[in-house]
Structures are given as C-alpha cells and as structure tokens.
C-alpha cells in the first residue's frame, strides 16, 4: 500500500506525461506535493521504486519509467484506456533507449569508431545532462580501446587546468566505479551531472574542480553515482 504522498507523486508524474509529454522537474514535483526540499522527492521516488511502481533508467538524468498504477486508480476505465508505461528522460517525453555501443567504421587507413554524442555536461556549476543521442562523431579507435563509450559536449570552465575547455567534446567510457584521481561524469541526486575529478574525503565523495575559482564539493556516497570515466578529448578550432 502506498502512502498518500507516494500516490500523489506517482499520479502527478503519470498525468503530466500523458497531458503534455514533458516531464516534471524535481522542483515541479516538490512544489506539486508542497514539500520543503527535493530530498523528500528523492525519498518518495526510492520508495516507489522499491514497491515496483517505477523504475529508474540508468545513465540518464531524471529518467524514470512508470511501470504500474495503484489498484484504485488503475481500475478507473478513463485512466486505463490511456495508460501505458511512461518515461521521464531529461527534457524529452519519449521512451528512453540504452545508449548504443560504438559502431565500427568501415576499414580505412586511419581506423575509427562512431560514438554517440549524448548531450552537454557542466564543467562548472552542475546542470541537468545526459539526454538523448544528439548526433554521432567519429573517434580514432586507439583513443578509446574496449568497452562502451559516449561523448559529451563541455559547458563551463571548471576543468581548464586539466586541459578541458568550454566547447570541447569529451569521450567517456561507461563505468559505475572510479579510482582516486579519475576525471568522471558524476550524477548528483539522480538529477544533475557534472565532470569533475574523483576524490575521497573520509566516507564522503569529493568532486574536485581543476580551476581555483571553484570549490571542491563534498557529498555523501548515496548522493553520487559514477556514470563514466574520461578517456579522450576532441577540440575543434574555428
């Protein structure tokens, strides 16, 4: 059985997706349920996931799939006629698909693979990131090695001392763990993504910038998910 707040959140997500196809943000969910902070939304989403009503989609910011509705609500014929699992994915109301693996390019003198560019990521103040496949780029095969990869466009200057500039394209190897000192894609509170150097501070995770103008940010380990590790960089000169 769901609590009143859990049911309110589930129905709000479902109805918003059915009405407009545009997912509610965490701020909108917080305001709709009249909660004081987004941490309450995170707890409700976790509870709904544990009870099998929603499923989080990996490697995507704010991505949820509505699997089922409460029995009383699902029994309403007007609702049931329009019900199908709904997906919240970034700013798009479309079903999410797993990021495709790199596709080998035709044999050539300089071998390359095609890697999907999945969106923009902040090298500065975290922003919502990792959305749909925007386009593909060809990457020298020696740059990436084995594993699944994707690319992100950099927005911000917090990693300039690591040689990563605003407008660069970074190549990321899909990974859920990191070693101290790795430059990683970190997803904070399942909502915001940023590119930072991975550190530990006691039991907490420290996301360290490579620019003295930005402070190192400290989070509990339950608030940060590693989405991948930096393996390469592409820069275009105009």
From Swiss-Prot:
UniProt entry keywords in alphabetical sequence: Autocatalytic cleavage, DNA damage, DNA repair, DNA replication, DNA-binding, Hydrolase, Repressor, SOS response, Transcription, Transcription regulation
Endpoints of the signal sequence: none
Annotated site residues (Cleavage) in this chain: 123-124
Molecular function per GO: DNA binding; serine-type endopeptidase activity
Catalytic activity, reaction form: Hydrolysis of Ala-|-Gly bond in repressor LexA
EC number: 3.4.21.88
CDD domains: S24_LexA-like (cd06529)
DNA-binding region as annotated in the record: 26-46
Enzyme class: hydrolase
Quaternary context: Homodimer.
Role noted for this protein: Represses a number of genes involved in the response to DNA damage (SOS response), including recA and lexA. In the presence of single-stranded DNA, RecA interacts with LexA causing an autocatalytic cleavage which disrupts the DNA-binding part of LexA, leading to derepression of the SOS regulon and eventually DNA repair.
Family: Belongs to the peptidase S24 family.
Protein name, as recorded: LexA repressor
Organism listed in the record: Sinorhizobium medicae (strain WSM419) (Ensifer medicae)
Gene: lexA
């Amino acid at each position: 059985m769901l609590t009143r707040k859990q049911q309110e959140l589930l129905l709000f997500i479902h109805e918003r997706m059915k009405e407009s196809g545009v997912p509610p943000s965490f701020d909108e969910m917080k305001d709709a349920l009249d909660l004081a902070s987004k941490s309450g939304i995170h707890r409700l989403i976790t509870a709904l996931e544990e009870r099998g009503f929603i499923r989080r989609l990996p490697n995507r910011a704010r991505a949820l799939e509505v699997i089922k509705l409460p029995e009383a609500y699902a029994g309403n014929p007007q609702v049931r006629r329009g019900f199908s699992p709904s997906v919240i994915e970034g700013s798009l109301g479309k079903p999410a698909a797993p990021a495709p693996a790199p596709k080998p390019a035709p044999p050539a003198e300089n071998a390359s693979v095609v890697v999907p560019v999945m969106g923009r990521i902040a090298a500065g103040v975290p922003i919502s990131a990792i959305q749909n496949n925007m386009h593909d780029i060809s990457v020298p095969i020696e740059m990436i090695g084995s594993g699944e990869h994707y690319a992100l466009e950099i927005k911000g200057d917090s990693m300039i001392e690591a040689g990563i500039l605003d407008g660069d394209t970074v190549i990321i190897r899909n990974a859920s763990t990191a070693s101290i000192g790795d430059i990683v894609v970190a997803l904070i509170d399942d909502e915001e993504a940023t590119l930072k150097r991975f550190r530990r501070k006691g039991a907490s995770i420290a996301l360290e910038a490579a620019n003295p103008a930005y402070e190192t940010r400290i989070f509990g380990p339950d608030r940060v998910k590693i989405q991948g590790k930096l393996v390469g960089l592409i820069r275009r000169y105009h």
